[in-house]
Amino acid sequence: IGTACELYSDSEGVYGERIMPEHIDRESFLFNSPFIHGSMMFRREVFRCHRYRTLGKNRKYEDYDLFMRLCADGYKSANLTDKLYCFYYDKALRAVSFSMRCDEYKVRMECFRMLGLMPKGIIYALKPILLGFIPRRATMKIKEKTNKV
């Protein structure tokens, strides 16, 4: 189970929020991870069968990878709509390298297959790579207008 959060930075203090979907199904993973990693709580038994995979392709995306594998294995998950977590998010420091975008693409392709989301998932798997071609300033404006910061 996860929760919504407030966003804050040193320069702005609390400046926004992220409200995550309450009910999660396999399609919830297509656009982005439907969870705020730091807010997640698990039953201990989950980690008897599943672990974070940190080799190669999923560096920085091990949480997204784990959440999708758990969903593929039939585990149920949800988010509380209450903002019970504060997340430090400095917009100025949020650059993503092209190699990281490629890593996310690989994780998405593998896990979307496990979730039975292909061929629909191909477009969503390409999202991180396609975003790499859009100027950073433009993506930040889009995020601000859609409250996705």
Regions found by a protein language model. Name each.
Residues 57, 109, 134-137:
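Juxtamembrane helix-loop transition sites at the ends of transmembrane segments
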Residues 17-18, 64, 87, 121-125, ...:
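Flexible domain-boundary/linker segments
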Residues 2-4:
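Short beta-strand segments
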Residues 6-11, 16-99:
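Conserved nucleotide-sugar donor-binding catalytic segment
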Residues 129-149:
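Terminal low-complexity segments of carbohydrate-biosynthetic enzymes
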Residues 87, 94-118:
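Catalytic core of nucleotide-sugar-dependent glycosyltransferases
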Residues 102-105, 116-123, 127-135:
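Membrane-interacting alpha-helical segments
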